[in-house]
């Protein structure tokens, strides 16, 4: 007979196939709540996918609504703007709740129970990601605090990754990708973003012959995203000041 942990993991897989990600989160939260040993690679990936989909839908909604709000403001439609602001605030409350949920799990259970280099980097990267999502829409002191927490988590992850993971390791590459996006999108620091992305890409290219079959696809995909962002950011920096809609940066697991 399956243990409660095995049953919840099984049901999380079922929920994923049915694309019912809120329930997938609930099943994986039960696994984490009863945690007596570190999550397996399968379990931590399920947790990540569940939260990625739950947060991703709302981040997309927030971007669309913010864009509509800007258009209505430029047209002077004050009544519409007031309604949209209220609607945007509702989505921001949902985003805050989701981010706080996973951040609490990471701080109370997951980071402390991580025993290997790759799991430590995985969870610290995740912590940085969800603080970054908060920084995307928070303002003032809350935004500053979220950005500082993002930077701290990513730097802690980077220190471990550089010491314990190969330059081609997909988790190390994914961290470099998201960290560079944070520099570009949140801190408005294109030079640091480009330097970090280029260094990660160059180090991985130099080591690419050592890639095993199992991680080849994941690693080369992230390397391509790093290169795409470098191309995009370099182009944006050259065109700075041009009045055009800019293509969003690409991040890992988003």
Curated annotation (Swiss-Prot):
<dbReference type="GO" id="GO:0005737">
    <property type="term" value="C:cytoplasm"/>
</dbReference>
<dbReference type="GO" id="GO:0008104">
    <property type="term" value="P:protein localization"/>
</dbReference>
<dbReference type="GO" id="GO:0007165">
    <property type="term" value="P:signal transduction"/>
</dbReference>
<comment type="similarity">
    <text>Belongs to the 14-3-3 family.</text>
</comment>
<dbReference type="Pfam" id="PF00244">
    <property type="entry name" value="14-3-3"/>
</dbReference>
<dbReference type="InterPro" id="IPR000308">
    <property type="entry name" value="14-3-3"/>
</dbReference>
<dbReference type="InterPro" id="IPR036815">
    <property type="entry name" value="14-3-3_dom_sf"/>
</dbReference>
<protein>
    <recommendedName>
        <fullName>14-3-3-like protein RA215</fullName>
    </recommendedName>
</protein>
<dbReference type="InterPro" id="IPR023409">
    <property type="entry name" value="14-3-3_CS"/>
</dbReference>
<dbReference type="InterPro" id="IPR023410">
    <property type="entry name" value="14-3-3_domain"/>
</dbReference>
